[in-house]
């Protein structure tokens, strides 16, 4: 697991690919939880909730980087 991507998610940074409309972020309600789950959105639809480790692996596979969500902006909380 990429520690950098995990820390970015834990700090509220949204990982995005605006061209493909794919986003992964940690909602504010998950901050400080023992097993944080991230939200994956694709094409404006919520595609699922992922444990942090799976979210990081998906972000690496999709080549997501810090970006701007169309509704949330730059940060998820």
Give each language-model segment a name.
Residues 6, 12, 27, 52-53, ...:
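Non-transmembrane, interaction-prone segments in cytosolic or luminal domains
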Residues 1-17:
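Negatively charged, low-complexity tracts enriched in Asp/Glu with abundant Ser/Thr
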Residues 16-57:
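Acidic, low-complexity, intrinsically disordered interaction modules
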């Amino acid at each position: 697991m990429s520690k950098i991507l995990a820390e970015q998610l834990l700090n509220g940074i949204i990982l995005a690919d605006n061209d493909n409309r794919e986003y992964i972020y940690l909602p504010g309600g998950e901050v400080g939880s023992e097993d944080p789950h991230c939200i994956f959105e694709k094409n404006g639809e919520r595609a699922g909730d992922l444990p942090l480790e799976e979210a990081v692996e998906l972000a690496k596979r999709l080549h997501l980087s810090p970006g701007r969500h169309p509704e949330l902006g730059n940060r998820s909380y």
